[in-house]
């Protein structure tokens, strides 16, 4: 809360909260959200809460919508979509919820700037809502297995790794290799044909890390980890 309070200036109009988080997989529990809300109440700031990974959490703390926090419903715009929960990436179908006056302006911009989502995507979204909840549960269980597998593998390689509790990404530190995140990714791709994302793509604070997605099959993840382990072993030999 103190860091947030210190970052707010008279020019601050909006706080963006993306959680569960991409790239770290971090979530926010009710106490943490309440602490943020306490700071927001001291200001006139609105909150844009990006909760597109809300169905994909794995620890004891389940997702809490920021608008549920007392006094925040009138100050919050929630954005969500079908891409992650229903595995509909590419359909580009989502929604927003917020105070009536703000939504009126959002609808105007959307109506005359974007028109509407394709009809086929809308029908697919309707069917997902009607019949897809069991699939979400099965998918979440599979993601959890992959998450725990990947966390164990990366740590066994000697990489420091924050345990993700949401989304489907893991964000290990690669500082011990002596490479920048871009160098690491380029070499891993060219030498072992494994693609990961440099942490620098997410800003200066992401440097020294790489983002790995576990939205692939266990067979793909096992093979990727085997190749990544070989890459790190070769790198150690090279640096001796």
What are these regions (language model features)?
Residues 1-240:
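PLP-dependent class I/II
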